[in-house]
Amino acid sequence: MFSSESVTEGHPDKICDQISDAIVDALLTADPLSRVAAEVVVNTGLVLLTGEITSQAQVNFTRLVRDKVAEIGYTDAKNGFCAESCAVLVAFDEQSPDIAQGVNMALESRGSQEDQFDLVGAGDQGLMFGFACDETPELMPLPISLAHRLSRQLATVRKNGTLPYLRPDGKTQVTVAYEEGRPVGIHTLLISTQHTPTIGAITEEAAVQERIRADLWEAVVTPVFAELPIKPDSHTRFLTNPTGKFVIGGPQGDAGLTGRKIIVDTYGGYSRHGGGAFSGKDPTKVDRSAAYAARYVAKNIVAAGLAQKCEVQVSYAIGVARPINILVETFGTGRIPDEELLRLVQRHFDLRPAAILAQFQLRELPRQRGGRFYQNVAVYGHFGQTHLDLPWERTDKAALLREEALAKATALLA
């Protein structure tokens, strides 16, 4: 069995991620060359913005924060946190010139400028992972895919008034049963959701929780699994608010910080993680852009039918454009050796930071999408959200990889 969790947009850490990425969107929309490292802290009645920004853009950060908090759903002081009454403190510095010099002029370009993609160095050292598997149509692990679906539906029924007693904070967790490496059933579903103290005339705590349990099954679980081949059955455990009432939540219940939900943001623990968060960072930061590129590589390999599972590691040195290493691992599911897959990757994927920026248009996308891009992936996962038309989710190189692998295999058999 394997478990993964997700959180709703009203979770304290996710509030921070969304504000951080709303800042990235606003700055890149006005100035695509902005350098951003925006960190956010939330607590009862407080939002603190800090980090480093170098940009020509002029942004009203206080208004941005209030608008995002209101969009999430914190518009009533009864929720313990309110968009219009919370204090907003802004404490940004400029990016260090020592860091900027390595990004502006990579090691490879000093003395030579033959290739424009050698001009931009990695913004930091680090290692990033990308992953894909054939458990879902979007080529994501099933546990995290289901957890995100439940969290998204939980927010939907709150916002559209289906369950008006729900409040913004919430978490989900799904445990999937596997046999011989393939998902076969749902072992446990867990939903914890913030709610009002009473539901209409229902005031007794046990009765409130009983109503919540019934409503969540009908309005959240049932729609999520309606068209999926694997469904909960009579053996599935269904847990809701296991500690009892969940009235105090959001920043009133727990402080939140940007970058504390990196497993929720990626593959739910199913794949390794390099440790770097995504939100609040402009795409010159390889923590973000290279993780997107590694997902793109892994997804195209799986989409090509060359493996059932694929994990790609890439690492960088600060100020150096070319990756230090690339690793391809298919966990014994590859149709061709991992070493040959690595050669395909090296031939067909340019993982230098500037090449990633150019191919995915990571600096231009916020402006192209009307000022909203990164904040949309700051909740419910940076991967697998195919409805958002994310460039790293495309499988436009799958056919090429498949054809070249087939040609290689045919040549070996000739």
UniProtKB/Swiss-Prot annotation:
What CDD domains does the record tag this protein with? S-AdoMet_synt
Q: Name one GO biological process term.
A: one-carbon metabolic process
UniProt GO molecular function: ATP binding; magnesium ion binding; methionine adenosyltransferase activity
* Region entry Flexible loop, spans: 95-105
| Localization, UniProt | Cytoplasm
An annotated GO cellular component of this protein is: cytoplasm
Q: Per its UniProt record, what InterPro entries does this chain match?
A: ADOMET_SYNTHASE_CS, S-AdoMet_synt_C, S-AdoMet_synt_central, S-AdoMet_synt_N, S-AdoMet_synthetase, S-AdoMet_synthetase_sfam
Q: Which reaction does it catalyse?
A: L-methionine + ATP + H2O = S-adenosyl-L-methionine + phosphate + diphosphate
Q: Where does K(+) bind?
A: 39
- Which keywords fit this entry according to its UniProt record? ATP-binding, Cytoplasm, Magnesium, Metal-binding, Nucleotide-binding, One-carbon metabolism, Potassium, Transferase
How many cofactor units bind, and how? Binds 2 divalent ions per subunit.
**Requisite cofactors:** Mg(2+); K(+)
Q: Give the EC number.
A: 2.5.1.6
Q: Where does Mg(2+) bind?
A: 13
Ligase as a keyword?
Answer: no
EC class: transferase
Q: Which domain of life is it from?
A: Bacteria
Pathway(s) served: Amino-acid biosynthesis; S-adenosyl-L-methionine biosynthesis; S-adenosyl-L-methionine from L-methionine: step 1/1
For binding L-methionine, which residues are annotated in this chain's numbering?
52, 95, 254, 285
Its biological purpose: Catalyzes the formation of S-adenosylmethionine (AdoMet) from methionine and ATP. The overall synthetic reaction is composed of two sequential steps, AdoMet formation and the subsequent tripolyphosphate hydrolysis which occurs prior to release of AdoMet from the enzyme.
Q: Which PANTHER family match?
A: S-ADENOSYLMETHIONINE SYNTHETASE
Recorded family membership: Belongs to the AdoMet synthase family.
What is the name of this protein? S-adenosylmethionine synthase
Species for this entry = Synechococcus sp. (strain JA-2-3B'a(2-13))
Record lineage: Bacteria, Bacillati, Cyanobacteriota, Cyanophyceae, Synechococcales
UniProt gene name? metK
